[in-house]
Swiss-Prot record:
GO MF entry, a single one: calcium-independent phospholipase A2 activity
Active-site annotation: C47 (cysteine sulfenic acid (-soh) intermediate), D140 (for phospholipase activity)
Gene: PRDX6
Remaining remarks: The active site is a conserved redox-active cysteine residue, the peroxidatic cysteine (C(P)), which makes the nucleophilic attack on the peroxide substrate. The peroxide oxidizes the C(P)-SH to cysteine sulfenic acid (C(P)-SOH), which then reacts with another cysteine residue, the resolving cysteine (C(R)), to form a disulfide bridge. The disulfide is subsequently reduced by an appropriate electron donor to complete the catalytic cycle. In this 1-Cys peroxiredoxin, no C(R) is present and C(P) instead forms a disulfide with a cysteine from another protein or with a small thiol molecule.
UniProt-recorded name of the protein: Peroxiredoxin-6
Protein source organism: Homo sapiens
Positions where Phosphothreonine occurs in the chain: T44, T177
């Protein structure tokens, strides 16, 4: 599949028609973090539950200066009509308004550019549809995270929020987040930081787990 982005790549500054009008991507992002996520088709069951959950979590993303924007190969008109179903799924007033725009990529230009097409899933004309892709961009417009799911498996937007919190924390502090980490849990001190420097950087304390190897690389500190 042609196109695609690698970690560290700058997001293409594309223009697109959306449910809130025409946008230029870099202008849309501004100085914020951004999540661009694609789905296979409007008016389908898994996609409805996904965008419903994204809408529910939109205030949590906004609190962290994260903008959401969705994409599929459907038209703006379909996006707006489908938005009523999404709001109804969330037991809210069935309006056309969602807390994020949806891109109209019916010609598949962006899907090809960004490597979002799923060759195994096709529309009624035999053309590939967009996979369940998630791109997280930092304020520098660079790709910080990419996730790719098949059409049959819905994404966990609570996990995407957790990952964004980790990305923002580790962008500001010299720490890493361990397996199953949640906001507020202890974090790990980077192995490149010498012991004496770590004590100064993390006044809440550094706790080292003793290991059979004798190496002192498992170092924890309360979340800064």
């Amino acid at each position: 599949m042609p196109g695609g982005l690698l970690l560290g790549d700058v997001a293409p500054n594309f223009e697109a028609n959306t449910t809130v009008g025409r946008i230029r991507f870099h202008d849309f992002l501004g100085d914020s973090w951004g999540i661009l996520f694609s789905h296979p088709r409007d008016f389908t069951p898994v996609c409805t539950t996904e965008l419903g959950r994204a809408a529910k979590l939109a205030p949590e993303f906004a609190k962290r200066n994260v903008k959401l924007i969705a994409l599929s190969i459907d038209s703006v008109e379909d996006h707006l009509a489908w938005s009523k179903d999404i709001n109804a799924y969330n037991c809210e007033e069935p309006t056309e308004k969602l807390p994020f725009p949806i891109i109209d990529d019916r010609n598949r230009e962006l899907a090809i550019l960004l490597g979002m097409l799923d060759p195994a899933e096709k529309d009624e004309k035999g053309m590939p549809v967009t996979a369940r892709v998630v791109f997280v961009f930092g304020p520098d417009k660079k790709l910080k995270l990419s996730i790719l799911y098949p059409a049959t498996t819905g994404r966990n937007f609570d996990e995407i929020l957790r990952v964004v919190i980790s990305l923002q924390l580790t962008a500001e502090k010299r720490v890493a987040t361990p397996v199953d980490w949640k906001d507020g849990d202890s974090v790990m001190v980077l192995p490149t930081i010498p012991e004496e420097e770590a004590k100064k950087l993390f006044p809440k304390g550094v706790f080292t787990k003793e290991l059979p190897s004798g190496k002192k690389y498992l170092r924890y500190t309360p979340q800064p």
